[in-house]
C-alpha cells in the first residue's frame, strides 16, 4: 500500500503528541486502581533484580571483575535505558492485533506519519516507576563507586543513556514489524523482549558465542554494557563504546524503515 508523503515540522508533531498524550492519560487515570497495582508490580519486579544481586554478592565478591556496586550501576543504567521503549513505544505490543483484525488501516489514511501516529496513541505510565527505581539504583551505585560528578561525565551519561535506549527501541520495532509478514508473530516480540534481562549483566561474563550474539546479532550488549563503560572506565574504553551513538542512530533508523516497509506491504482484512 502506498500513500502520499506528508512532511510536517517538529512543532506540529509535538502539538499532536501532547493532545494525544493528555487523552491517553485521562483514560488511564479513570482506572486508578489498575494503574496503582500495575505500577507497584513494575517496581516489585525491578526490586527483585536488586535483591538477586544482593544475594549473589554475599557469596561471591566479584564476577569477572565486576563487584556489587558496579553491577548495580549497570542494572540501574539498563532500567533507565529501557524506560523510553516502555513508555513511548509500548503500542508495538498491539500492532499484530491491529494488523490481523484489519483495524490498522485507519492509521494509513491520516495526513501524518503512520509510525508516529501509531506509537503516540499509548503512553505506558508504569515505565515512570521503572525510571524512578533505575535513577535511585544508579545514584546509589554512583556514590559508592566514587565516580566524579563533572559536566563532561554528566554529558556522557546523557548521551550514552539515549544511545542505549535507541538500541532497545530498534529491537522491539523490528520484532513488532514481523507481524506484517508472519501470522502469529507474538512469539518474536516475547523472545526479543526477554533478551532485555541479559542487558543488566556485563557482556564479558558470557561465553564467546553469546558475546557475539549479543553484540552483532541482537545487540543487547549496547543497551547497557558498552554505553556504561564510557562512565565506568577512564582508560581502555572499547572502540564499540565510542561507536555506540552512531550505531544506535543507524539501528533505530533501519528498524524504522523496516517497520514502514511493513506498512507499505500491508493488506488490510477484506482487501
Label every model-predicted segment:
Residues 2-271:
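Hydrophobic transmembrane alpha-helices and immediately adjacent juxtamembrane helices
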Amino acid at each position: 500500500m502506498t500513500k502520499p508523503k506528508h512532511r510536517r515540522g517538529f512543532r506540529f508533531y509535538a502539538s499532536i503528541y501532547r493532545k494525544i498524550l493528555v487523552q491517553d492519560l485521562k483514560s488511564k487515570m479513570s482506572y486508578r486502581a489498575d494503574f496503582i497495582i500495575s505500577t507497584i508490580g513494575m517496581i516489585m519486579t525491578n526490586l527483585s533484580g536488586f535483591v538477586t544481586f544482593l544475594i549473589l554478592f554475599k557469596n561471591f565478591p566479584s564476577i569477572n571483575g565486576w563487584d556489587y556496586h558496579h553491577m548495580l550501576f549497570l542494572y540501574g543504567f539498563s532500567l533507565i535505558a529501557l524506560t523510553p521503549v516502555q513508555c513511548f513505544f509500548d503500542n508495538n505490543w498491539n500492532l499484530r492485533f491491529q494488523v490481523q483484525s484489519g483495524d490498522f488501516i485507519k492509521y494509513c489514511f491520516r495526513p501524518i506519519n503512520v509510525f508516529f501516529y501509531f506509537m503516540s496513541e499509548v503512553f505506558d505510565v508504569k515505565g515512570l516507576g521503572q525510571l524512578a527505581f533505575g535513577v535511585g539504583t544508579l545514584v546509589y551505585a554512583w556514590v559508592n563507586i566514587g565516580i566524579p560528578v563533572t559536566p563532561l561525565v554528566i554529558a556522557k551519561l546523557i548521551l550514552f543513556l539515549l544511545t542505549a535506549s535507541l538500541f532497545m527501541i530498534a529491537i522491539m520495532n523490528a520484532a513488532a514489524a514481523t507481524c506484517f509478514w508472519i501470522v502469529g508473530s507474538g512469539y518474536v516480540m516475547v523472545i526479543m523482549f526477554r533478551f532485555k534481562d541479559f542487558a543488566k549483566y556485563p557482556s564479558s561474563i558470557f561465553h564467546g558465542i553469546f558475546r557475539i550474539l549479543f553484540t552483532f546479532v541482537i545487540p543487547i550488549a549496547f543497551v547497557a554494557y558498552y554505553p556504561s563503560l564510557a562512565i565506568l572506565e577512564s582508560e581502555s574504553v572499547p572502540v564499540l563504546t565510542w561507536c555506540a551513538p552512531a550505531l544506535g542512530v543507524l539501528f533505530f533508523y533501519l528498524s524504522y524503515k523496516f517497520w514502514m516497509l511493513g506498512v507499505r506491504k500491508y493488506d488490510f482484512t477484506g482487501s
